[in-house]
């Protein structure tokens, strides 16, 4: 009996050691989201990318995430917590996480960090972004074709270059169809606030807009469009199920392939901090199926999407600034540095840019 007990204890210990070794062999990849994964928008889409990592890399990885993390001291604590809990690669998915990631990356030099939509790097901190503005040009063209009032309502979060270039690209697309098209802007000073987003949509519709665009994360604005029997666009993910009659298309973010490649690089020992800006041609920016529009508008949108995928830049001159002063000459193309520092509107935007 004593020999049997010793044998059982030895077997249990062996299994425990094997399990510990297996856990140690796994790479822990972690994400920090500014909103809830149930926003069905920006944070949701990043989390879909995390799930794709799990599916693609299987038992090689363990993943974890923190959601609803505020930009500021809360973000400092979130990144430090994940680093202390054994995360080997951490993705911060909001612009406002930039300084917290820089700070925590210095404290944990052996942890790999990546930051979405920012511009600061370090020896163990890379940055990645998507050219959302490419898709917004197509949205602008569709809006100009579908709008009866010639006015779009645009709901936005914070006056950072990514948001400003999106507004401008949308306007350039719209004015390529209707030179007199206008956009009214409402700043809600939040990435995710369904109440504010809904109120903004109602106010814009009351002011004469008949189509709504957003650079915020909830489905609220599009649902208001559905209630008003008007139109709008999904943001970050396909929101058609929330507004089956209102959604014309959605600007969707496809993070999965990028996340898989970066986590695989971490596994292989080949990860290095990088500066990546992916677009339509890379499959990182996509447009959901074109719906609730005539065939000719759909064909136009498809043609423009292909044109951009083939290398055409929406910020190709001639383009004038909001006050009418020339910015880009005929055929001149804005470089990435200019876009990433964009702090002015193009002609046609009905708003004073907050400073």
Model-derived regions: residue spans:
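Positively charged n-region of N-terminal signal peptides that target proteins for export
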Residues: 1-4
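Bacterial N-terminal signal peptides
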Residues: 7-16
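A residue-level marker of the well-folded mature domains of exported/periplasmic proteins
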Residues: 24-355
């Amino acid at each position: 009996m004593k020999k049997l007990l010793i044998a059982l204890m030895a077997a249990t210990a062996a299994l425990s050691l094997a399990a510990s070794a297996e856990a140690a062999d796994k790479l822990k990849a972690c994400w920090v989201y500014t909103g809830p994964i149930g926003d069905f928008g920006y944070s949701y889409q990043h989390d879909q990318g995390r799930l794709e990592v799990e599916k693609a890399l299987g038992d090689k990885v363990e993943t974890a995430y923190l959601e609803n993390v505020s930009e500021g001291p809360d973000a400092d604590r979130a990144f430090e917590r994940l680093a202390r809990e054994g995360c080997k690669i951490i993705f911060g998915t909001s612009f406002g996480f930039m300084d917290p990631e820089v700070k925590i990356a210095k404290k944990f030099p052996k942890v790999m960090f990546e930051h979405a939509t920012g511009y600061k790097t370090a020896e163990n901190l890379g940055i990645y972004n998507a050219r959302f503005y490419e898709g917004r040009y197509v949205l602008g063209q569709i809006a100009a074709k579908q709008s009866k009032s010639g006015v779009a309502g645009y709901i936005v979060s914070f006056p950072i270059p990514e948001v400003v270039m999106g507004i401008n690209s949308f306007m350039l697309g719209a004015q390529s169809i209707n030179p007199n098209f206008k956009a009214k802007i409402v700043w809600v000073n939040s990435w995710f606030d369904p109440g504010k987003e809904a109120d903004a949509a109602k106010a814009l519709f009351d002011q004469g807009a008949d189509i709504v665009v957003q650079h915020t994360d909830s489905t609220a604005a599009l649902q208001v469009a559905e209630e008003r029997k008007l139109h709008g666009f999904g943001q970050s993910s396909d929101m058609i199920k929330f507004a089956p009659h209102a959604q014309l298309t959605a600007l969707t973010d496809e993070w999965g392939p990028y996340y898989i490649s970066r986590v695989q690089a971490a596994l292989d020992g080949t990860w290095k901090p990088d500066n990546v800006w992916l677009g339509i041609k890379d499959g990182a920016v996509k447009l959901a199926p074109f719906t609730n529009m005539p065939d000719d508008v759909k064909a136009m949108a498809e043609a423009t999407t292909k044109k951009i995928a083939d290398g055409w830049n929406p910020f190709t001159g001639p383009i004038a600034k909001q006050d009418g002063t020339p910015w880009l000459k005929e055929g001149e193309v804005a470089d990435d540095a200019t876009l990433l520092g964009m702090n002015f509107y193009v002609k046609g935007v009905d708003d004073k840019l907050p400073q």
